[in-house]
């Protein structure tokens, strides 16, 4: 007998839960995607405005990864300018 395990894919919010409250997702949407905040939030939630499943496609996931890496670099550079 074969057992089929139905695993739900984590939403992007779930994957990025550690930084969720520290990031302005609306600013990421505008600056890196040239999209509205609502478009971005729907992708993050995994559900579109019509309550249908949605997610970032591969290109968008790569773009989001790059955006977060760019932001991390910018934060690091800003931190290094603080005189101690």
What are these regions (language model features)?
Residues 55-75:
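DNA major-groove recognition helix of helix-turn-helix/homeodomain DNA-binding modules
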Residues 34, 46, 50, 70, ...:
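Amphipathic alpha-helical interaction surfaces
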Residues 24-32:
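Short alpha-helical "recognition helix" segments of helix-turn-helix
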Residues 22, 34-37:
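Alpha-helix boundary/capping and short turn/kink residues
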Residues 4-20:
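Short, amphipathic alpha-helical "recognition" segments used to contact nucleic acids or chromatin
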Residues 2-5, 69:
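Cell-surface/extracellular proteins and modules involved
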Residues 5-6, 48, 75-84:
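Short, charged recognition helix plus adjacent turn
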Residues 36-56:
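Recognition helix of helix-turn-helix/homeodomain-like DNA-binding domains
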